Protein backbone atom coordinates (compact mmCIF):
# COMPACT_ATOMS: atom_id res chain seq x y z
CA UNK A 1 0.00 0.00 0.00
CA UNK A 2 1.50 3.36 -1.02
CA UNK A 3 1.39 6.78 0.53
CA UNK A 4 -0.97 9.42 -0.78
CA UNK A 5 -1.99 13.00 -0.13
CA UNK A 6 -0.71 14.58 3.06
CA UNK A 7 1.28 11.47 4.06
CA UNK A 8 3.20 11.62 0.79
CA UNK A 9 3.89 15.35 1.23
CA UNK A 10 5.14 14.75 4.77
CA UNK A 11 7.35 11.90 3.53
CA UNK A 12 8.97 14.08 0.85
CA UNK A 13 9.39 17.02 3.24
CA UNK A 14 10.97 14.74 5.83
CA UNK A 15 13.51 13.31 3.38
CA UNK A 16 14.40 16.71 1.90
CA UNK A 17 14.89 18.02 5.44
CA UNK A 18 17.13 15.10 6.37
CA UNK A 19 19.37 15.77 3.36
CA UNK A 20 19.58 19.44 4.35
CA UNK A 21 20.33 18.54 7.98
CA UNK A 22 23.05 16.14 6.89
CA UNK A 23 24.72 18.77 4.70
CA UNK A 24 24.54 21.41 7.43
CA UNK A 25 25.74 18.99 10.09
CA UNK A 26 28.85 18.21 8.07
CA UNK A 27 29.56 21.90 7.52
CA UNK A 28 29.25 22.61 11.24
CA UNK A 29 31.38 19.61 12.18
CA UNK A 30 34.14 20.68 9.79
CA UNK A 31 34.32 24.17 11.34
CA UNK A 32 34.93 22.72 14.80
CA UNK A 33 31.70 24.06 16.28
CA UNK A 34 30.59 22.39 19.53
CA UNK A 35 28.13 19.67 18.52
CA UNK A 36 25.36 18.51 20.84
CA UNK A 37 23.09 15.49 20.76
CA UNK A 38 19.55 15.87 21.97
CA UNK A 39 16.09 14.43 22.03
CA UNK A 40 14.22 17.31 20.41
CA UNK A 41 12.52 16.19 17.22
CA UNK A 42 11.45 18.19 14.20
CA UNK A 43 9.05 15.50 13.02
CA UNK A 44 6.85 13.49 15.37
CA UNK A 45 7.50 10.34 13.33
CA UNK A 46 11.27 10.82 13.25
CA UNK A 47 13.22 7.56 13.43
CA UNK A 48 15.74 9.21 15.77
CA UNK A 49 13.87 8.42 18.98
CA UNK A 50 16.94 7.35 20.94
CA UNK A 51 20.14 9.30 21.49
CA UNK A 52 22.09 6.18 20.47
CA UNK A 53 20.43 6.37 17.05
CA UNK A 54 21.31 10.04 16.72
CA UNK A 55 24.93 9.26 17.59
CA UNK A 56 24.98 6.46 15.01
CA UNK A 57 23.70 8.94 12.43
CA UNK A 58 26.48 11.39 13.36
CA UNK A 59 29.06 8.65 12.84
CA UNK A 60 27.44 7.61 9.56
CA UNK A 61 27.85 11.23 8.43
CA UNK A 62 31.57 11.14 9.17
CA UNK A 63 32.06 12.01 12.84
CA UNK A 64 34.33 9.78 14.91
CA UNK A 65 32.51 7.67 17.52
CA UNK A 66 34.36 9.49 20.31
CA UNK A 67 33.33 12.92 19.01
CA UNK A 68 29.72 11.72 18.71
CA UNK A 69 29.79 10.47 22.32
CA UNK A 70 31.20 13.84 23.42
CA UNK A 71 28.18 15.48 21.74
CA UNK A 72 25.94 13.64 24.22
CA UNK A 73 28.11 14.02 27.31
CA UNK A 74 30.94 16.48 27.94
CA UNK A 75 29.91 18.99 25.26
CA UNK A 76 26.46 19.33 26.85
CA UNK A 77 28.02 19.92 30.26
CA UNK A 78 30.33 22.59 28.86
CA UNK A 79 27.49 24.43 27.08
CA UNK A 80 25.43 24.34 30.30
CA UNK A 81 28.36 25.75 32.28
CA UNK A 82 28.63 22.50 34.26
CA UNK A 83 31.91 21.10 32.95
CA UNK A 84 33.46 18.82 35.56
CA UNK A 85 30.13 18.50 37.39
CA UNK A 86 28.22 16.37 34.86
CA UNK A 87 28.98 14.69 31.55
CA UNK A 88 32.19 13.08 32.78
CA UNK A 89 33.40 10.21 34.92
CA UNK A 90 35.53 11.97 37.50
CA UNK A 91 35.83 12.15 41.28
CA UNK A 92 33.16 14.47 42.66
CA UNK A 93 31.12 14.63 39.45
CA UNK A 94 27.50 13.52 39.26
CA UNK A 95 27.27 10.68 36.83
CA UNK A 96 24.69 8.52 35.18
CA UNK A 97 26.44 5.56 33.64
CA UNK A 98 25.67 3.31 30.70
CA UNK A 99 27.61 0.04 30.63
CA UNK A 100 27.74 -1.52 27.18
CA UNK A 101 29.04 -4.72 25.67
CA UNK A 102 31.86 -3.44 23.48
CA UNK A 103 33.92 -0.32 22.93
CA UNK A 104 31.60 2.49 21.83
CA UNK A 105 34.61 4.76 21.21
CA UNK A 106 35.63 2.36 18.44
CA UNK A 107 32.19 1.11 17.32
CA UNK A 108 29.22 3.37 18.09
CA UNK A 109 26.81 0.44 17.71
CA UNK A 110 28.01 -0.82 21.09
CA UNK A 111 25.73 1.82 22.66
CA UNK A 112 22.81 -0.38 21.72
CA UNK A 113 24.27 -3.39 23.57
CA UNK A 114 23.30 -2.19 27.05
CA UNK A 115 24.52 -4.32 29.95
CA UNK A 116 23.68 -2.01 32.88
CA UNK A 117 22.42 1.49 33.62
CA UNK A 118 23.18 3.53 36.71
CA UNK A 119 21.36 6.74 37.53
CA UNK A 120 22.51 8.88 40.46
CA UNK A 121 24.57 5.92 41.68
CA UNK A 122 21.69 3.43 41.62
CA UNK A 123 21.39 0.47 39.29
CA UNK A 124 18.24 0.55 37.17
CA UNK A 125 16.44 -2.65 36.20
CA UNK A 126 16.69 -3.70 32.57
CA UNK A 127 15.17 -3.55 30.05
CA UNK A 128 14.52 0.18 30.10
CA UNK A 129 11.56 1.12 27.95
Task: Report the location of each language-model feature.
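C-terminal cap of metal-dependent C-N hydrolases
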Residues: 72-74, 78, 91-129
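His/Asp/Glu-enriched, well-ordered alpha-helical/loop segment
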Residues: 2-11, 17-100
Amino acid sequence: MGLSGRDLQTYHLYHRSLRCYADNFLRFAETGVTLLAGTDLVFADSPFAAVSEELRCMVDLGLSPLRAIAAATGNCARVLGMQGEIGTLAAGAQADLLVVDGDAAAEIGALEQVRAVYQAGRSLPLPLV
